[in-house]
């Protein structure tokens, strides 16, 4: 159970994310596939990262991106090591942030997305605690014809010892 821990081994976080994605895949009758790319430099049992910061972005990719497309959705989760941090890139081929906002109902618009706002609050707390700058960057992806090709989220996480 990682819910009470501030930091977990990368391997534990990957296991939790994989379980979450498998459950959502079953729930949505395999409407999406996912791929995990792990930098071989990451020691999955020795490198610790803040717990539960990646999952809300996977949830957004599924619910607000992929569920809006016809055909099979794709999610890629890539973890890369750079000195004392791990960069996590979550990329989907969904409808994109602009279209997702357009198709929201008035009820959905009134409801704030708590998952990502909680992550941002946690990042601010962790930044103050560790004296570092963790950040999240959103990139809208487009096909050559200008149509949306999905969303990329880049999360910089410290390796915590």
Where are these regions (language model features)?
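Intrinsically disordered, glycine/charged-rich C-terminal tails and inter-domain linkers
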Residues: 159-161
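A short beta-strand-to-loop motif within the catalytic HATPase_c
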Residues: 128, 135-147
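Two-component histidine phosphotransfer core
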Residues: 1-135
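Hydrophobic core positions in the C-terminal catalytic ATP-binding module
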Residues: 75, 143, 149-157
């Amino acid at each position: 159970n990682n819910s009470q821990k501030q930091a977990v081994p990368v391997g534990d976080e990957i296991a939790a994310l994989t379980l979450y994605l498998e459950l959502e895949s079953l729930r949505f009758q395999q409407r999406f596939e996912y791929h995990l790319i792990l930098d071989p430099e990451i020691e999955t049992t020795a490198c610790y990262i803040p717990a539960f910061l990646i999952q809300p972005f996977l949830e957004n990719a599924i619910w607000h991106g992929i569920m809006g497309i016809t055909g099979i959705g794709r999610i890629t989760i890539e973890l890369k090591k750079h000195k004392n941090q791990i960069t996590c890139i979550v990329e989907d081929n969904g409808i994109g942030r602009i279209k997702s906002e357009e198709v929201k109902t008035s009820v959905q618009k009134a409801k704030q997305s708590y998952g990502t706002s909680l992550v941002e609050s946690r990042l601010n707390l962790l930044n103050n605690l560790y004296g570092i700058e963790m950040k999240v960057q959103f990139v809208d992806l487009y096909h050559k014809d200008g149509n949306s090709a999905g969303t990329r989220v880049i999360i910089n996480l410290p390796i915590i010892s």
